Amino acid sequence: MGLDGNNGGGVWLNGGGGEREENEEGSWGRNQEDGSSQFKPMLEGDWFSSNQPHPQDLQMLQNQPDFRYFGGFPFNPNDNLLLQHSIDSSSSCSPSQAFSLDPSQQNQFLSTNNNKGCLLNVPSSANPFDNAFEFGSESGFLNQIHAPISMGFGSLTQLGNRDLSSVPDFLSARSLLAPESNNNNTMLCGGFTAPLELEGFGSPANGGFVGNRAKVLKPLEVLASSGAQPTLFQKRAAMRQSSGSKMGNSESSGMRRFSDDGDMDETGIEVSGLNYESDEINESGKAAESVQIGGGGKGKKKGMPAKNLMAERRRRKKLNDRLYMLRSVVPKISKMDRASILGDAIDYLKELLQRINDLHNELESTPPGSLPPTSSSFHPLTPTPQTLSCRVKEELCPSSLPSPKGQQARVEVRLREGRAVNIHMFCGRRPGLLLATMKALDNLGLDVQQAVISCFNGFALDVFRAEQCQEGQEILPDQIKAVLFDTAGYAGMI
């Protein structure tokens, strides 16, 4: 099997000898040079550039029992057996009898070969796509050849034109023959691929046979009529439009409102158009989106909150603080929620008003002579100036409590490192003794840093550290004792 590209047309032919069949039944791992040599004529320009095939190719085609693929079409309709319609067909598996061939004519040029491989010289047992290139065994495949290739041609002489885009009937089927692909390949019949731009058929920009890009029809964007129901493709197109518009308008639809519970309701987006549940068109007949304020789900947006949101938060915090203060004042609180706190506070105020009214009624019912004196019954919490003066006089007068019996005044003075001293003094308590003692120590030039004073059951003074502040004059312990005894009222006790 090979491609004869020396002449005007390209013909896939099967050799007559058994050696050619043995080569076709070889394994998939055959040398790549053998496989590429068979495809080399396909890449040359003479394979498809000629308008008419060579007469030798037509003679070889008629003599060969096995037909693979014919690259060019002859001008004579009698010689082109692929484009002839059969008058009668007995095949029951063909979907359309109008495009099937007569069984007697099929055996003349399309024979079934199950043992031969496809264009790549692959055995039928190892190539799962072998049936895609066997034209003679499937009558249904002949319909696929007729449908895209011979569809819309007024006469077979139009196939000689290099630019098939000028044929008006061919424009409707051009998108089916050249679908858009990422690898710039176009699927022909039976899974066979050809480059997008072929010599002689024009470039993609010029609207050639194979190189022209498929014009994507957009019937999905147009809504159906009012009486008809939308198709599945129109539904999917509307869903894509609605999803894209939702993403585009997500930033602009930020309207909010506040509820009583502090939740924030955002703008809900609802697309009106095709009703996918009941397969009916909406009454408005518009496929655009409509924004409904106050609907949709609840949520919170990221970013800085609005000013009114911050003010609302401050107001709620202040209200909660006042409620907590009211709850602390009201003695009887049944529950801790806001309604219970306010209800209990109202009940407590009513109870207080009732007690005030009862006291007023009691005062009015009692006679004036039977009232007790106010001086004995009223004891204010804060002392008046008269009571303060009485207390000061009592403090200044000698104490009625005498000193403990058998105890005499005692004063001890000890020197410490440096110029510091320790003083321990105990004597009977009398008014003004503490003030007189501190003045005496100050006159001696001693700075008291740490001291403990007790006036319970006598007067006790413990100075743990007192330093001499005057330089050049050192005070002896005996001098300190004499001054303290004299201050306590025990002169000459040393």
From Swiss-Prot:
Principal place of residence: nucleus
Polar residues bias spans: 48-58
Biased segments, Low complexity type: 242-253, 364-377
Tissue: Widely expressed in the whole plant with high expression in leaves and stem. Broad expression within stomatal cell lineages of leaf epidermis.
Domain bHLH as annotated: residue spans: 303-352
A GO MF label: DNA-binding transcription factor activity
One matching Pfam family: bHLH-TF_ACT-like_plant
Induction: By high-salt stress, cold stress and abscisic acid (ABA) treatment.
Assembly and interaction partners: Homodimer. Efficient DNA binding requires dimerization with another bHLH protein. Interacts with the C-terminal part of HOS1. Heterodimers with SPCH, MUTE, and FAMA.
Protein name: Transcription factor ICE1
Source taxonomy: Eukaryota, Viridiplantae, Streptophyta, Embryophyta, Tracheophyta
